[in-house]
């Protein structure tokens, strides 16, 4: 029965996906994090994670697999397994992205061509210094509390698995007390109100300024409230995934 097989596959994918996501709250030295993914359907293609590497370092990562279902969930599982087994390389975002790229390429078949956008940040939780790399994902935004300005961590790079040959770069990041970094997928930017007007990148930046709170969970709730007001009771048009990181 094709219908029963379909339901069983969805259940497997859901279980796999739920096992990949971290607890929503994370704290380490000067940093507080909160992450949440809201799917428009039973299964989303978004992936987020953050975890401690050693006594001072931690990583933040976010991905978006093209498509949904079992295939997307398995790609996420492979990515997490690959990252967790990377040891000392966890401090080098571009090495991690290159390894994931090779993994996605190797997992492709003629029937199923998977592509995954991905971003990776390694942070020193004491100094506030880090390294960031991006593979086709939305550029994170940094809210500088001292100036009230929102900056973009802009770094180009193709999606994982999109091309056989790929070069991934990394850039330094330095955060001060009161700063916040917001990772997001394009679901928030492309959300439309009842007249069809998108929030857009400028709208999102304004939303981040107006929503700021040193507690990342409260910051997220403030952003989500403004998003809900914008769509005006309509159903979500896409998955909505955020990681918010604040520096004490």
Regions found by a protein language model. Name each.
Residues 2-181, 229-248:
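… and, occasionally, acidic/histidine-rich disordered N-termini of signaling adaptors
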Residues 86, 194, 209-210:
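Short, flexible active-site loop motifs that bind/organize anionic cofactors or intermediates
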Residues 96, 100, 208-224:
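A short, conserved beta-to-alpha structural element at the edge of catalytic cores
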Residues 142-145, 192-198:
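Cytochrome P450 core scaffold surrounding the K-helix E-X-X-R motif
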Residues 188-190:
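Short acidic/polar inter-strand loop motif in beta-rich domains
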Residues 197-209:
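Divalent-cation-assisted or electrostatically stabilized phosphate/pyrophosphate-binding catalytic cores
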């Amino acid at each position: 029965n094709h219908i029963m097989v379909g339901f069983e596959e969805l259940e497997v994918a859901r279980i796999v996906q739920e096992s990949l996501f971290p607890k929503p709250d994370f704290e380490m030295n000067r940093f507080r994090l909160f992450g949440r993914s809201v799917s428009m359907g039973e299964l989303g293609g978004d992936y987020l994670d953050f975890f401690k590497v050693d006594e001072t370092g931690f990583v933040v990562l976010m991905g978006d697999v093209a498509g949904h279902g079992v295939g997307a969930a398995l790609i996420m599982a492979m990515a997490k397994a690959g990252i967790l087994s990377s040891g000392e390389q966890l401090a080098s975002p571009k090495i991690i992205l290159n390894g994931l790229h090779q993994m996605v390429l190797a997992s492709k078949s003629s029937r199923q061509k998977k592509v995954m956008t991905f971003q990776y940040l390694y942070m020193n939780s004491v100094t506030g210094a880090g390294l960031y790399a991006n593979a086709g994902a939305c550029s994170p935004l940094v809210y500088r509390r001292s100036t009230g300005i929102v900056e973009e961590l802009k770094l180009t790079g193709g999606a994982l698995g999109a091309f056989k040959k790929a070069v991934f770069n990394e850039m330094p990041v330095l955060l001060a007390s009161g700063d916040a970094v917001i990772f997001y997928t394009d679901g928030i930017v492309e959300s439309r109100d009842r007249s069809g007007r998108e929030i857009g990148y400028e709208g999102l930046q304004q939303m981040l300024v107006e929503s700021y709170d040193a507690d990342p969970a409260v910051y997220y709730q403030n952003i989500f409230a403004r998003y809900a007001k914008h769509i005006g009771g309509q159903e979500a048009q896409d998955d909505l995934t955020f990681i918010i990181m604040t520096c004490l």
